[in-house]
Amino acid sequence: MKVRSSVKPICEHCKVVKRQGVTRIICKRNPKHKQRQG
């Protein structure tokens, strides 16, 4: 999980999800792409 100020989808499989006001990126194909805004 990368914590970044600016989160962007890295590949076409990345999904943007908002949970409790926190923007996250989840990726089934490549879990290395997981990110959270912080």
Curated annotation (Swiss-Prot):
Gene Ontology biological process terms in this record: translation
GO-annotated molecular function: structural constituent of ribosome
Example of a GO cellular component annotation carried by this entry: cytoplasm
Coiled-coil portions: none
Keyword tRNA processing: no
Record's keyword terms, sorted: Ribonucleoprotein, Ribosomal protein
Keyword hit for Transport: no
Family under the similarity heading: Belongs to the bacterial ribosomal protein bL36 family.
Protein name per Swiss-Prot or TrEMBL: Large ribosomal subunit protein bL36
Organism, as annotated: Gemmatimonas aurantiaca (strain DSM 14586 / JCM 11422 / NBRC 100505 / T-27)
Species classification: Bacteria, Pseudomonadati, Gemmatimonadota, Gemmatimonadia, Gemmatimonadales
